[in-house]
Amino acid sequence: AAAAGDSAASDLLGDNILRSEDPPMSIDLTFHMLRNMIHMAKMEGEREQAQINRNLLDEV
């Protein structure tokens, strides 16, 4: 999943852009930032859940 996100980021940064050499539009950058924030929030939630799971297993 991370590779797909990296690919999207590369596309937005112009590494693998298929259209002309136009710079990324501001809406592209806005959605890129939004995707990054959602990804970071998901990772944080998974980290917190993993810690809760560890605590539960320690109690058993």
Curated annotation (Swiss-Prot):
Pfam families: CRF. GO terms for cellular component: extracellular region. Its main location: secreted. The modification Valine amide is found at V60. Residues 1-14 have a biased composition (Low complexity). The keyword Secreted applies. GO terms for molecular function: hormone activity. Keywords: Amidation, Cleavage on pair of basic residues, Hormone, Secreted. Residues 1-22 are annotated as: Disordered. InterPro entries: Corticotropin-releasing_fac_CS, CRF, Urocortin_CRF. It is found in: Secreted. Urotensin is found in the teleost caudal neurosecretory system. It has a suggested role in osmoregulation and as a corticotropin-releasing factor. The non-hormonal portion of this precursor may be a urotensin binding protein, urophysin. Belongs to the sauvagine/corticotropin-releasing factor/urotensin I family. This is UI.
